[in-house]
Amino acid sequence: MRLDSFPASISVPYEVRSGFQAQGGLPSPSGHTSLRVSVFDSCFCTEVLPHGMYPVYLTGILTDLHEEHSQSSFLGINFRDGDKRSQLADVLREYNVPVIDYPRHFEGCPVLPLSLIQHFLRVCEHWLSTGNNQNIILLHCERGGWPSLAFMLSCLLIFKKLQSAEHKTLDLIYREAPKGFLQLFSALNPMPSQLRYLQYVARRNISPEWPPMERALSFDCLILRAIPSFDSDNGCRPLVRIFGRNIIGKNASTSNMIFSMPKKKTLRHYRQEDCDVIKIDIQCPVQGDVVLECVHLDLDPEKEVMMFRIMFNTAFIRSNVLMLNSDDIDIVWGSKDQYPRNFRAEMLFCELGGISPARPPTATLNGDMKGGLPIEAFSAVQELFNGVDWMESSDNAAFWLLKEFSANSLQEKFQKLILSDMEELSKFQAKVGLQIPLMSPLDSDEEKYSVASDSVSSSEHEKVQPGGNSSDSENINHDLTTEDTASMGNVLVNTPSVLPPTTPPPCGSLSILSTDENQLPPEVQHESPSDRKLPSPSPTAAAPPPPPPPPPPPSGNKPAFSPPPPPPPPPPPPLPQSNYASSQPPPPPPPPPLPNCLVPSPPPPPPPPPILPNRSVPPPPPPPPPLPNHSVLPPPPPPPPPPSLPNRLVPPPPAPGIGNKFPAPPPPPPPPRSSSRTPTGAATSSKGPPPPPPPPLPPANRTNGPGVPSAPPPPPPPPPANRSNGPSAPAPPLPPPLPAAANKRNPPAPPPPPLMTGKKAPAPPPPPPQAPKPPGTVPPPPPLHGASGRPHPPSSKGLNAPAPPPLLGRGREATGSAKGRGIGLAQQSNPPKKASLKPLHWVKVTRAMQGSLWEDAQKQGNQARAPDIDLSELESLFSTAVATNASEKGGTKRGSAISKPEIVHLVDMRRANNCEIMLTKIKMPLPDMINAILALDTSVLDNDQVENLIKFCPTKEEIEMLKNYNGNKEMLGKCEQFFLELMKVPRVESKLRVFAFRITFSTQVEELRTNLTTINDATKEVKESLKLRQIMQTILTLGNALNQGTARGSAVGFRLDSLLKLSDTRARNNKMTLMHYLCKLLSEKLPELLDFDKDLIHLEAASKIQLKLLAEEMQAINKGLEKVEQELAASVNDGAISVGFREALKSFLDAAEAEVRSLISLYSEVGRNADSLAQYFGEDPARCPFEQVTSILVIFVNMFKKSRDENARTAELEKKKLEKDKEKATLSAKKVLE
């Protein structure tokens, strides 16, 4: 046999399986690794060699080992079953190889006690560190010992710091065996308990003394939250057994069963529909390693089904509580779905000196104590309530209570209280554990661990006779103490080196003996438990009102060829589209460009001005280029059309090529009636259909513009009436055909609004500016000299005529040359880019309502004219870019700002901005902040700031990104600098979470302690109130008086929810309830009982507390302490940066553990008192939890007080009425006498 490589398959069973690498613990192809630990392949096989073949197999392997590793010494470690002598020890003794035998389980769990784990680790560490680092350890296990061998090997890897992750290490070793190999030897999944002990090993750096001293504790109770399903009723009948060291009996060093519930048919059955909490009182002292088994006892007492198993050590129970979920307990393979998702096992402990004495049974209200009034006092009630049925109490108090309060304001509260998880409930078990005698000793109740070395040979001791010489052996009782471990180390140190088999010197054989353990785990059985689519809007509703005519705002523009909604009547026509617009969406019509007729003949006429919408708006124009913010201002009023001029003033045709590419100006708004004036200027070609027009003008009044062949006529203005032609989808509706007399070759220009009769046109406004050219269009030539003599468009008198929009993109000169006039100035299109104005975020009105001031402003003309606005002043005050004063700041600073290198951002900009905002709230340098975190200084950082720091801890991707950045780190942004500072601290997020827990710990503990104290006080007040006791007895006597002679009579007590029915039972006159009668009776007979509510001052506050929430808070505190403990252990390897952090955390942990320990004691006491309160009223805590008891009592107290006050008011009114009647009688008597 050779150790050169691993076998290709596990099916080759008997070879030495070579060790595990020092890095990562992975199998190495070479037989000699730094760990120098080898595992026999027989440990991975289920086959059994025929009798006599096993020594031959071992002899062959050992011969090869001595040949290949002649300079090495070997140590054999065997995990054996029971106390019988192993064949491995017999064979290895012949080669002078010492063997240590360990048990393969502890009370059925494949985890060895912590003292044996410590012994194993020290032995391995000592052996591997001697012999010039050439010694080798041979691991072997007998049949069924693989789970223990894998666990101990994992402990060694973590102890030697070759692995750090417990779960990964254990899983890594288990994967060396065939799939399903672990399930063959363990009916339960042992990994949760094994991981718990691996964590014990991994946390050895927390305290200089490891393992810590095993504390003697009293196991108070076991609480199971959320009932697991192990039968057809979705419930279970749990039976708990505890194995460990009997610290009270004579054999304190041996392990046996120290607690067991009575195995009887009357064992309580818990169902999920009845309750969700199982509480089992244990009251058993424990110390050291403890195994807890919970089995489900079927109706057949002999049939047990294993539910779960937990193994733990009391030395690592820091806060007297151990809370585990379904992932932390050993359960049957594949039974995870039998446990609810929120299942939790809580084990509560207290100090051994504080173990509670055996509690007497809780005194109930309806016991031997008598009180209240005799039944003779209720003679009147039988007549008063004769014929009124005393309501039967339901068997299900919770259901009845929910139904009873479904019609009042407390319905929601009681639904939550009754139907929610019922907490801290289980059938009261009065000191079951202390009344059960210990079971008869089994064969394996006592285990003896002994180390044999150099003593006289005997029949009970192992014998080594190499070369015919007998070696002495000495039997040393091993009681699992540290001293014995040290002695074992000394024995191994003195062990001589291995010599050839022919002449080996005498050598001690090391063996840890244990009695044969024939007790098998209980039989494990498993039983299975039984767009909404939004409606499409109509075309009319889908389209919002179109924007006003040019210049339009960017957000309201749509392509002219998109399907428009029916235009609102009367719509003004949109801009005619050019050939360019037919292939792609054209730009929006800017302020009117120079007309097509500018080129051939001077002087060119000014273009038509923008259209002012009157009562309707056209379909949206094509999307425009980006406009400045102030382009959303209201549209200006239209400039007046040109006056009627002679034919000689008609402009010449446009230049060639312009008519097909340049968009035509929009027509002026329609007149209220037909106009005889003829406009100037020629229309351009338009391919897009215009919106519905008004009736066409007479052909005789139109003058055609020459030079535009075969161009369709532009749309005329819409009519004033609310009529419109039907639209044709998807394009806007076409205008009606022109009159027959119209010239088809030369279409007429759109008509302007008529001049008002008898009015004289004012002076013409300045010419319009030039609009920015859309792509693909040919810019028109500039205006010719002498344009001042060109005709100007007039306006009707009385109308506010603003100037055409200024030139776009021409800077301040263009803007300043055209001063605004009234409302028309507000609709500037594309102001200069150098002076972008801040927007006024108003809600624009696109259609003036009839009778509004906006409509009046358009009609009044100059009377309501707004003052002229100086745009230069407006730009200097409301410019988006801060204007710089050249005389003050100069150009040098501007140049330096441009040359300044840009900040490098590696993190997402949104996250970086949020991080910088967060950092501005923490006003301190980053190094100081890191020092405050490491010092756990709560005076510098509060909880909110720490939580924000946790949110902005760098992710793995961000850390890699920053590590790979090779540029100048000083040029990184603030967020990146912050991340770099955090990266200097190992596990900074974990430290921040510990810091956050440190900040909130005091508040959490104080709030929890206050709530627990409130429950205790309320329970004590209720149970010690003599007045409440007498009132309950009075109610019992009252009910028996009403039910006398019926099946409901002669009751010895009543259910607690019957208190709520006192107000539902009314007298025959319907003026009084039984609650009123009770108060009346007490006020007459026992008035001192009326103020019994003063004895229950904490009852209402306790009714608002839920034990389930308290349990969750307790678990959160306990988990937080575990995280603190883990971080403290991990920070040992951080170096100097975490020295102060470890000191501060260790100080906090010591104080916090003491605080939580006292809190756990109070929490356990509260649980017992909450159960006893239900038992005080004769209720089952599982069916009537503490929350329901207190809520019923609070409601009863409030109803009693209300009835008492109503009786007092009624008595006062009757008294006044009697006084008035008496006065009337006196007056009547006087009148009679007179």
Curated annotation (Swiss-Prot):
Residue span, FH2 domain: 827-1226
Region feature Disordered, mapped onto this chain: 443-478, 492-840
Positions with biased composition (Basic and acidic residues): 524-534
Transmembrane intervals: none
Ranges annotated as biased composition (Pro residues): 498-507, 536-576, 584-656, 663-673, 688-699, 709-721, 729-739, 762-784
Residue ranges constituting the Phosphatase tensin-type domain according to the UniProt record: 1-208
Catalytic site: C141 (phosphocysteine intermediate)
Keywords linked to the UniProt accession: Hydrolase, Protein phosphatase
Domain (C2 tensin-type) ranges: 214-352
Hydrolase as UniProt keyword: yes
SUPFAM superfamilies: (Phosphotyrosine protein) phosphatases II, C2 domain (Calcium/lipid-binding domain, CaLB), Formin homology 2 domain (FH2 domain)
Alphabetized SMART domains for the sequence: FH2, PTEN_C2
GO molecular function: phosphoprotein phosphatase activity
Gene3D superfamilies, alphabetized: 2.60.40.1110, Formin, FH2 domain, Protein tyrosine phosphatase superfamily
UniProt record similarity statement: Belongs to the formin-like family. Class-II subfamily.
Name of this chain's protein: Formin-like protein 3
Native source organism of the sequence: Oryza sativa subsp. japonica
The encoding gene: FH3
